[in-house]
Amino acid sequence: MSKQLVSIIDVPKHIGEEITIGAWVANKSGKGKIAFLQLRDGTAFFQGVAFKPNFIEKFGEEEGLEKFDTIKHLSQETSIYVTGMVKEDERSKFGYELDITDIEVIGESQGYPITPKEHGTDFLMDNRHLWLRSRKQMAIQQIRNAIIYATYDFFDKNGFIKFDSPILSSNAAEDSTELFETDYFGTPAFLSQSGQLYLEAGAMALGRVFDFGPVFRAEKSKTRRHLTEFWMMDAEYSFLSHDESLDLQEAYVKALIQGAIDRAPQALEILERDVDLLKKYIAEPFKRVSYDEAIDLLQAHEKDEDTDYEHLEHGDDFGSPHETWISNYFGVPTFVVNYPASFKAFYMKPVPGNPERVLCADLLAPEGYGEIIGGSMREDDYDALVAKMEELGMDRSEYEFYLDLRKYGSVPHGGFGIGIERMVTFVAGTKHIREAIPFPRMLHRIKP
């Protein structure tokens, strides 16, 4: 059998031709003289059909019956080389199918644990290394790949340079209570929560920079939106205003959605994602509302029949129900800007004339997906930043390099970060973030 293989995703290019593919058997059915194989090769799924009379005619009765019997008894996830003629077939959900003419078993698969029946989440997570082979999980990872590709493409086109921040650090970028600590040759070190502080150094050297890599948060959270290890894209830029930053963030998110539509259309179809709704998010401008305006809206509607959130006063932080209501109220991704300084990071620049608010923004995704981007303008004044650190009782010695950026040619600058898994969950329309990463790390899960 020829081993010049064709990928399933390229099969439509070979209508009327005999081809060979390498694939796994996702499922099979049939009876009597016909057998149907559901095949996958990592690029897509499609169907092959084997007719017993055709095998007898081609190979003779003894060998033909033997090959057809092999097909009928293939077990789930057996790997095979399969040869056949590609034929258009309107009855097939793929629009075409493979008329199988030969088969060769590569690797047997006996007792595959994930069968077509329903399984519980814990069982599927324990077998995550195998669950990834399912149609839905493959589709989610294809969307993840499309979003990562679109990230690199967007920043390259917008003049950004990839800048690699360290994963081990001696300081915290955000909340020090959420750090994973390790020993670094006798000195305490921490797994990175964010590359932001180092990216600011990159922005002072290169103007526009971004990084992309794993970050770690020791959050004891069991929600559907939290992981302890996830992949973060952080971007930093010099000489950009707050409004220009929001414009950039909006363009970036729209590019990610478009990237998934362009590069993973079959995956979106498998997941039954409403692509017209995604296109609406691209076509319409994102809403921008201040934190205080959002609080006023929440208070005005808190007694409506369809609301389900707790009362908030000005100065309170949002919970997930509040974020969901805000984004659903506007129906498109919504920037909430200028939060209280009291619960935001030390490095955020105050709103001119209103030191109780900072120049920041969270982008809230509709459909209940909540925050997907957090960003701010950074405090670029040395004395103001030192005063803020002293107010919070921070150890300046851990941040000398960061303060130096304000001593030697400081400029207005800002940045934002996006957790790729949250974006994947939103674009894919899935319910839980654990499916947006190949091997999720959560409060009570570090295997497989």
UniProtKB/Swiss-Prot annotation:
Similarity comment: Belongs to the class-II aminoacyl-tRNA synthetase family.
SS bond partners: none
Superkingdom of origin: Bacteria
Keyword flag Nucleotide-binding: yes
Keywords for this protein: Aminoacyl-tRNA synthetase, ATP-binding, Cytoplasm, Ligase, Nucleotide-binding, Protein biosynthesis
NCBIfam families: asnS, PRK03932.1
Biological process terms in GO annotation: asparaginyl-tRNA aminoacylation
Keyword Mitochondrion: no
Signal peptide as annotated in the record: none
Record note on quaternary structure: Homodimer.
InterPro entries, A to Z: Aa-tRNA-synt_II, aa-tRNA-synth_II, aa-tRNA-synth_II/BPL/LPL, Asn-tRNA-ligase, Asp/Asn-tRNA-synth_IIb, NA-bd_OB-fold, NA-bd_OB_tRNA
Pfam families (UniProt xref): tRNA-synt_2 (PF00152), tRNA_anti-codon (PF01336)
EC number: 6.1.1.22
Reaction(s) this enzyme catalyzes, per UniProt: tRNA(Asn) + L-asparagine + ATP = L-asparaginyl-tRNA(Asn) + AMP + diphosphate + H(+)
Matching CDD domains: AsnRS_cyto_like_N, AsxRS_core
Xref: PROSITE patterns: AA_TRNA_LIGASE_II (PS50862)
GO molecular function: asparagine-tRNA ligase activity; ATP binding; catalytic activity, acting on a protein; nucleic acid binding; transferase activity
Name of the featured protein: Asparagine--tRNA ligase
Location in or out of the cell: Cytoplasm
Annotated Gene Ontology cellular component terms: cytoplasm
Species for this entry: Streptococcus thermophilus (strain ATCC BAA-491 / LMD-9)
